Amino acid sequence: MLKDELLNQYITYIYSCSCAETLVKSGVKPTMTAGYSMGIYASLYIAGSVSFETGLLFIRKAYEAIRGSLPHDKFGMGGVIGLSEKDIRDITDHHNLDIVMVNRNSDHSFIVAGSSFHINLFLLKSREEGALHARSLGVTIPYHTSHLSEAANKLSETVYSADVVDPETPIISVLGQDLILDAGRARKEVVNNIHTPFNWLATQLQMFNSGIRIFTECGPSQALRKNSKFIPGSGKFVKWVNLVRKDRDGLMR
């Protein structure tokens, strides 16, 4: 299972970098980038902070650090849509669940992580409470939780010795919504990302408040574009392929 998760991260990274590169080569350059969860690596690459190879290195070293510090089958993650933060905390507290809310996509869309048994129980109770959607994310790693603190320390050995430079394009942190403008801050984000909860809702709203109105998702999923419909006043998401500038013959540049 873990090897499949590593392969999926490689594929997603390569796809995301390819999409973003296609846009840039056609003349569409980002004002700002943001990395949703493990999207931090592609975000750093397209911002010019790391090479493509360094991004792959970070993914592999993070996987190896996690593999060396966690049991393979005792953790998981889940997504729930249709409940409030209070609903989720009430379920967690009432059933004494060993889970953590690790991301808020919108006011009624959340990601949780923790014990696989408790994740499954949480999803069951969420459906009973009226959640519109509650499912396992199919991973065995509790990303963005303190369970990965040891792995983060191990990963830092690679990150702080790797070639990382100041980003050419500002990167907004999904952890704290501040701008990542230098190499030191970029390194810190990579290390903290795997064991710290993030907030996509706050991140997208911060980008909107900074003047950005057009967003695109460079990856195989359209989840963020769909999610944006539930964030009032957050700008417009456009499919990346629809933003690619074309030549007179209608071909991508």
Segments predicted by a language model, with ranges:
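Helix-rich "cap/lid" substructures immediately adjacent to catalytic or cofactor-binding pockets
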Residues: 1-34, 112
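Conserved small-residue
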Residues: 16, 39, 80, 112, ...
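Gly/Ala-rich beta-loop-alpha elbow adjacent to hydrolase catalytic centers
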Residues: 16, 31, 35-39, 43, ...
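Non-catalytic positions within long, well-ordered alpha-helices that form the structural scaffold/packing
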Residues: 24, 127, 208-209
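Short acidic/polar active-site loop segments enriched in Thr and Asp
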Residues: 29-31, 132, 213-214
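Alpha/beta catalytic cores of group-transfer enzymes, especially the acyltransferase/condensing modules
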Residues: 47-195
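A short, acidic, amphipathic alpha-helical segment used as a generic capping/interface helix at domain edges
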Residues: 194-212
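Short acidic, glycine/proline-enriched helix-loop-strand junctions
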Residues: 223-253
